[in-house]
């Protein structure tokens, strides 16, 4: 009897550090501090890890889900207009309007999109407070051109598009997919120091492929002169576009008409240079 009492007094309960001794648990806090100026923090964001997916509206996501020990890819992103996400691949929607149904053209104004990925190793009986430093993946591009030549004042419309825009991005590997096109919605500046210049603003997931070409047509009042073919290679000016997406990029160039006899045969935009701040009147 005494031996049994002595034996039972030696038995102790196993102590654990968490209420989930066989699993791990995560809490993810999103850090939006790297977003561009004037961009709001997204209203909702999504967390995926293993077979778990959750949506959050607060600063920190603390799911009840328990994770078995192992290695996982944590992916965090926000729903954005015109962008779908499958796994860690984001895809820009096809263009609508006059380009609807044309796979070669993608949406030129998707919503602001942010992502984060991390490899997480889970051990049992542990809690993991994680911080997701959200990376801005959509960048704004503005092109400003100053027409020259006798027909500059007769321009009524610039119809153009940009090649070499990325339609997809695997944000876990920072890999851009095949090149697509985006419409450049040029409008004439009618007020201020830059009146008479033309400007187009788009949002891009990134640039890809070997070149980025601006191609299109310049149209004139009363069809005089006849429409001018427009072409410009801006590959060099966009070579660093996929880095520093938190800052918008403005490029300025001079629209040079090339006459042939009494007709305007073609036009090129030369001297693309970055324009800092709001100053687009920088010797374009």
Go through each PLM region and give its residues:
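Short, low-complexity, Pro/Ser/Thr/Gly-rich segments in the mature regions of secreted, periplasmic
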Residues: 184-190, 268-284
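Conserved "repeat-terminator" motif of extracellular CCP/Sushi domains
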Residues: 20-21, 130-138
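Tryptophan-paired
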Residues: 40-92, 154-238
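Structured interaction patches on ligand/partner-binding surfaces of diverse proteins
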Residues: 82-129, 223-256
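C-terminal motif of bacterial Sec signal peptides marking the signal peptidase cleavage site
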Residues: 6-9
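Short structural boundary motif marking the start of a folded domain
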Residues: 22-28, 72, 139-141
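Structural motif
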Residues: 28-42, 144-153
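Bacterial lipoprotein signal-peptidase II cleavage site
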Residues: 11-17
């Amino acid at each position: 009897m005494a031996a049994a009492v002595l034996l039972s007094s030696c038995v102790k309960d196993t102590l654990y550090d968490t209420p989930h001794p066989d699993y791990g648990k995560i809490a993810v806090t999103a850090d939006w501090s790297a977003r561009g100026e004037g961009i709001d923090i997204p209203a909702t964001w999504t967390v995926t890890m293993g077979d778990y997916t959750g949506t959050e509206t607060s600063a920190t996501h603390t799911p009840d889900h328990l994770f078995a020990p192992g290695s996982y890819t944590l992916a965090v992103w926000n729903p954005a207009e015109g962008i779908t996400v499958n796994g860690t691949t984001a895809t820009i929607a096809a263009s609508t309007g006059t380009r609807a149904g044309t796979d070669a053209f993608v949406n030129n104004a998707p919503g602001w999109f942010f992502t984060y990925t991390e490899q997480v190793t889970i051990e049992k009986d542990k809690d993991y407070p994680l911080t997701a430093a959200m990376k801005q993946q959509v960048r704004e591009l503005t092109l400003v051109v100053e027409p020259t030549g006798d027909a500059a004042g007769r321009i009524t419309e610039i119809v153009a598009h940009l090649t070499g825009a990325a339609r997809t991005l695997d944000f876990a590997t920072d890999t851009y997919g095949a090149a697509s096109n985006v419409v450049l919605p040029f409008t004439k500046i009618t007020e201020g120091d830059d009146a008479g210049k033309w400007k187009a603003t788009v949002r891009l997931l990134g640039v890809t492929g070997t070149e980025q070409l601006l191609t299109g047509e310049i149209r004139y009042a009363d069809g005089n002169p006849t429409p001018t073919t427009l072409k410009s290679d801006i590959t060099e000016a966009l070579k660093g576009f996929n880095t520093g997406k938190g800052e918008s990029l403005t490029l300025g160039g001079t629209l040079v008409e090339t006459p042939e006899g009494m007709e305007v045969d073609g036009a090129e935009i030369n001297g693309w240079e970055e324009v800092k701040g709001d100053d687009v009147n920088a010797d374009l």
